[in-house]
Amino acid sequence: MKPPVFPISALIPQVLEVLRQHSRLVLEAPPGAGKTTQVPLALLDAPWLQGRKIILLEPRRVAARSAALFMARQLGEEVGGTVGYRIRFENKVSARTRIEVVTEGILTRMLQDDPMLETVGAILFDEFHERHLSGDLGLALALDVQAQLRDDLRLVVMSATLDGERLARFLDAPRLSSEGRSYPVAVSHFPARRDEALELQVRRAVQQALAEHPGDLLVFLPGQREIARVQAGLQESLDGSVEVLALHG
């Protein structure tokens, strides 16, 4: 499989050089730049890794599965080989796994079981701009391990929108920035009706968008309940040529 070219690809040599000389890195890259999948793969053969694992932390289970699947396909393998993932109630890793994509609670349990993280050479914190307790705790614990037990442990904080300069100062880490992909965007507003339920408004908006534009739609909703209601309504009102998928978790 020919490796895809991402905006982050041009920055990979600098990432490797920085991590050869430093144990920490702050990497800024917009959505779609390829940081989630291309950076872990690029680090696989780094001499300082010494055969240890790379842990990639994702804030959501869907993202963890998707990232692992994409990287495994790039290597021409199935998930659970060189690349695997671990999330709550689901484990797709093996003795051969070198890149583990995990949700943040998994890292906390790993530290409880192995405080020195002896089998881990690098931890990558993806989407760190989505600040929440689990991610902050994971970074704090990893910094503690690095400072007291494992000065060879590499920590990479990756973000799309967080103030990278401020974070780099806090971590005393080099900072790299990648270009992203640009697409033309047109903003329009759909008239809302105050007396109409959310799912009905979304249904009307989707029907209008499908009638006026080719391609796919991505609809953002507040929670799982709203997603289920909108999905049911769209499946009733749209013909069989439109597939309605619920994405959450």
Regions found by a protein language model. Give the residues of each.
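P-loop NTPase motor module signature
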Residues: 1-249
